[in-house]
Swiss-Prot record:
Its EC number is 1.3.8.14. This is L-prolyl-[peptidyl-carrier protein] dehydrogenase. The gene is pigA. The active site is at residue 244. The keyword Flavoprotein applies. GO terms for molecular function: acyl-CoA dehydrogenase activity; flavin adenine dinucleotide binding.
Length: 386
């Protein structure tokens, strides 16, 4: 068992980290304080490779596995303070680009995929509804079959990238009586008649990552814009969530690494009672806990992604890593603030903002309560474990 990264994996990480530091982190504080998402930087980052993932070279992708994609995104999280921009990129890749690549028709891939991979188009994934969050298959949006396609009606909320999106991956019921098998996936373009995108909703966290609600009023969707077979939307969504939980979690592992470095540097430099505060056991113990959390998160995430790349069932591993990383990200954020003391309140330092940005990791891509249900099911505690 070799725990070393290969030379190519190390190169992927180091190159992505340098790009994140040198390009995306520049003026990050200004953008964040002004709640601005720079679409220019977003497109540069996508073209660099952060929107490539497993997509084939044919469509401009990098043909990376889940582990290599996670390494790249971890480097992004460590190198750039602009987590809002990074989150937007990851949502675009994991919930839009990857499902289109894995399940879309040749016609859809030829029409959209290269532009999505290279950053010419921005995508949003629309699944969550007012009464369908954790209970996602209770969605009320419908795509009623009609001659030549479908008529879409409904409402989606908390849709990341919606205000800036050029295309939308939509999930709606094509047969309300069939539950999981009654959901289908579609791709629609901005400006489609009947598509209404709401104003940006202000947030206390990830404040420069735009989201809004979207409403569908009698939208005609040609059959050619359906992703996968009719009724395959549940399986497509489930597959995309495996990628999203793994890769978005990697972003927060990168944040843990950055936070540890910042806190360690401060503990060595800050003097109290005639010595560096890191010399005090209460402080050093907190930093040791932060280090332990980081290494645990890396090991669990890397193993989960490796299993996925090997074609093994990694659902429980992905759920466990997402659960662990999100809980640890919040706790380490609190420990960093405790170590910095009053200095942590400095907005320029960004520690309170960092903590706020960590909290959503316990909610998105399935809440931590849902991750525990997944793990319980895989352990045979909720009926079948298949």
């Amino acid at each position: 068992m070799d725990f070393n990264l290969s030379n190519s994996q190390s190169d992927i990480y180091e190159s992505a980290y340098r790009f994140a530091c040198d390009v995306l982190d520049q003026d990050a504080q200004t953008r964040i304080s002004q709640k601005i998402l720079s679409t220019e930087l977003w497109k540069k980052a996508a073209a660099y490779g952060f929107a490539h993932g497993p997509v084939s070279h044919q469509f401009g992708g990098s043909e990376l596995g889940a582990l290599d994609t996670a390494l790249m995104i971890e480097a992004l999280g460590k190198g750039s303070r602009d987590i809002g921009l990074s989150f937007s990129l990851c949502a675009h890749l994991c919930a839009c680009v990857i499902p289109l690549y894995r399940f879309g028709s040749s016609e859809l891939k030829d029409k959209y995929l290269e532009s999505l991979v290279t950053g010419k188009l921005i995508a949003a994934n629309a699944a969550t509804e007012p009464d369908a969050g954790s209970d996602i298959y209770n969605m009320q949006a419908t795509a009623q079959p009609c001659e030549g396609g479908y008529i879409l009606n409904g409402k989606k909320i908390f849709i990341t990238n919606a205000p800036i999106a050029d295309v939308f991956i939509i999930y709606a019921k094509t047969n309300p009586d069939h539950g999981f098998l009654g959901v289908s996936a579609f791709l629609i373009e901005k400006g489609t008649p009947g598509l209404n995108v709401g104003e940006v909703i202000p947030k206390d966290c990830l404040s420069n990552c735009p989201w809004s609600e979207i409403v569908f009023n009698d939208i005609f969707i040609p059959q050619s814009q359906r992703i996968g077979m009719e009724g395959a939307g549940g399986a497509i969504f489930h597959d995309s969530m495996i990628w999203e939980k793994g890769c978005l979690s990697a972003l927060f592992v990168g944040g843990l690494a950055r936070l540890l470095e910042t806190t360690l540097e401060y503990a060595k430099a800050r003097q109290q009672f005639g010595k560096a505060i890191g010399q005090f056991q209460s402080v050093s113990n907190r930093i040791i806990d932060m280090k332990l959390r980081l290494e645990q998160c890396r090991l669990m995430l890397y193993r989960a992604c490796w299993k996925h790349d090997q074609g093994q069932d990694a659902e429980a591993d992905i759920a466990m890593s997402k659960l662990l990383i999100s809980e640890y990200a919040v706790q380490s954020g609190l420990d960093a603030i405790q170590t910095f003391g009053g200095a942590a309140m400095d907005q320029e330092l960004g520690l309170v903002r960092h903590l706020l940005n960590m909290i959503p990791s316990r909610i998105f891509s399935g809440t931590n309560d849902i991750q525990k249900e997944i793990i319980a099911r895989k352990l045979g505690l909720r009926g079948t474990s298949s």
